[in-house]
């Protein structure tokens, strides 16, 4: 498979994995042939990179949790030590015109997701006093935010669910909210919090301002697998790209451009189904059976999305 060759070359020459405490994480991989390989452990990022070159998986994941025995197959015997707090904002979950129009990666939909991610960061930092450890473009239609503050690591599923409810304004009482963060208890009163909870004031006129559209299942799962920052997204061929908060202020087109892994050359694609609409930086107008010569990154994206086949 031509795409697999491109992935292997990327992992051999360009990949920079961004993950803390490698030796305490479970890693999981989805091969190009399908299935899932779980409960892998590595002593270093370099050992992980060698594995990626040798096996060339389509998808690479690491656990949000830290374990005493990350390679143990029995979850009860892994020895859970705590878990990062993970937030996933995905265009698939955004009810905006741009995201409804296309299920492929479009810059317009990503800008909507980027705005939602900025709203999340504002709530985390200004309302809850949490500092994101890592912000990552998923390589597809959204963003991941990792929080590793000491006070959140020991939070169980129930406490994380309370936080989800707060972020999504589910059953929200605008006069008072209590959130337990480890030993710290934050009481949020509209009249007492610095900034007077901007979301509450805006929410009187626009209820959408109260709600942050996160994937609630991801955040409350204390054993969650999340895409490995620096790896390639097997649905798109784009890199899962670590970002700064300043990067997140830029247009999504600039973010995607930095995530392009295959910048050189063109490939010939035969379309296996009709495709008409925006895809990445381009607009595609092709019918089933059409043949087009496209930039390598776009050809790989279309094959991974099952819209065409690359051939010599």
UniProtKB/Swiss-Prot annotation:
Known cofactor(s): Mg(2+); Mn(2+)
One of the protein's GO biological processes: DNA replication, synthesis of primer
Keywords per UniProt: DNA replication, DNA-directed RNA polymerase, Magnesium, Manganese, Metal-binding, Nucleotidyltransferase, Primosome, Transcription, Transferase
Catalytic residue list: 88, 90, 215
Any single GO CC term annotated in Swiss-Prot or TrEMBL for this entry: DNA-directed RNA polymerase complex
Signal peptide: none
Molecular-function GO term, any one: metal ion binding
Class of this enzyme: transferase
Disulfides per UniProt: none
E.C. number(s) listed in UniProt: 2.7.7.-
Coiled coil regions in record: none
InterPro entries assigned to the protein according to its UniProt record, in alphabetical order: DNA_primase_S (IPR002755), DNA_primase_ssu_euk/arc (IPR014052), DNA_primase_ssu_PriS (IPR023639)
Keyword Transit peptide: no
Record function comment: Catalytic subunit of DNA primase, an RNA polymerase that catalyzes the synthesis of short RNA molecules used as primers for DNA polymerase during DNA replication. The small subunit contains the primase catalytic core and has DNA synthesis activity on its own. Binding to the large subunit stabilizes and modulates the activity, increasing the rate of DNA synthesis while decreasing the length of the DNA fragments, and conferring RNA synthesis capability. The DNA polymerase activity may enable DNA primase to also catalyze primer extension after primer synthesis. May also play a role in DNA repair.
NCBIfam families noted in UniProt: primase_sml
Subunit note: Heterodimer of a small subunit (PriS) and a large subunit (PriL).
Family according to the record: Belongs to the eukaryotic-type primase small subunit family.
The protein's name: DNA primase small subunit PriS
Source species of the chain: Pyrobaculum neutrophilum (strain DSM 2338 / JCM 9278 / NBRC 100436 / V24Sta) (Thermoproteus neutrophilus)
């Amino acid at each position: 498979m031509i795409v697999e060759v491109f992935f292997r070359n990327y992992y051999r020459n360009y990949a920079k994995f961004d993950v803390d405490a490698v030796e305490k994480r479970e890693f999981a991989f989805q091969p190009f042939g399908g299935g899932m390989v779980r409960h892998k452990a590595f002593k270093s990022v370099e050992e992980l990179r060698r594995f990626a070159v040798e096996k060339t998986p389509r998808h690479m994941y690491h656990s949000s949790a830290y374990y005493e025995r990350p390679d143990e197959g029995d979850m009860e015997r892994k020895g859970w030590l705590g878990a990062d707090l993970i937030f996933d904002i995905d265009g698939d979950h955004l009810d905006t015109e741009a995201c409804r129009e296309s299920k492929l990666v479009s810059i317009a939909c990503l800008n909507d997701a980027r705005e939602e991610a900025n709203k999340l960061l504002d709530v985390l930092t200004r309302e809850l006093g949490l500092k994101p450890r890592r912000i990552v473009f998923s390589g597809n239609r959204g963003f991941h935010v990792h929080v590793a503050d000491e006070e959140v690591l020991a939070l169980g599923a129930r406490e994380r669910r309370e936080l989800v409810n707060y972020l999504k304004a589910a059953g929200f009482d605008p006069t008072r909210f209590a959130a337990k963060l480890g030993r710290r208890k934050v009481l949020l009163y509209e009249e007492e919090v610095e900034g007077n909870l901007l979301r509450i004031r805006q929410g009187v006129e626009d209820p959408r301002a109260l709600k942050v559209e996160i994937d609630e299942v991801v955040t409350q799962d204390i054993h969650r697998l999340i895409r490995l920052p620096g790896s390639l997204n097997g649905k798109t061929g784009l890199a899962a790209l670590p970002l700064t908060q300043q990067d997140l202020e830029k247009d999504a087109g600039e973010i995607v451009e930095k995530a392009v892994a295959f910048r050189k050359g063109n490939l010939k694609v035969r379309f296996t189904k009709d495709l008409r609409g925006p895809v990445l930086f381009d607009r595609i107008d092709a019918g089933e059976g059409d043949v087009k010569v496209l930039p390598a990154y776009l050809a790989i994206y279309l094959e991974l999305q099952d819209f065409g086949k690359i051939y010599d």
